[in-house]
Amino acid sequence: KNLKSSTHKEVDDDLKVVNSLVDQLAQVNKLIMSGGSKNSSPDILDARDQLLLDLSKYINFTVDYGDSNDAIVRLGNSGNGKILLEKTNKSVLTSNVQEGRLIFNISRNAINSMNNDISSGLLFGAKNFYDFVGEVESEINQLAFRLSQDFNEIQQNGIDLNGRTGMSMFSIDSM
């Protein structure tokens, strides 16, 4: 349980970084759009490109450029994913757990929706790890339950040194 909790916290921390990078990109887009496509300084464009590079460590996305050379960022690899940033309008990524699995959500203009477009990067790896830990935990619990049943059966069929029938070794009511 601690491993899942710490992984979920790590995902939430990474999402804060992602959302901060998107905020910074929105500010850079604002600077780019105020200068026009021909007047954008190379330093501003370099800053935008560095922010996009930093973002790519966490999530996969595609980028198109608007008339003013502003970045339009969509989640996923298809170019048709949900919009993370368009001009200065940004979305917010969050996570929650549903049925033991980690789910990413995207919120834009107070509209929330589930997102399945993230398929690489640190966040995707952490999500897969979280889900894997849950599956392994379930399998270990099933194995422990079966072992305790088998031990109890063997114990109950045996006789102790005083000739008494054995009693259950494990209480499996709580398993």
Predicted regions, residues:
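Long, non-coiled-coil amphipathic alpha-helical linker/lever segments
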Residues: 1-32
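Phosphate-proximal small/polar/acidic motifs at interfaces that engage nucleotide phosphates
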Residues: 31-175
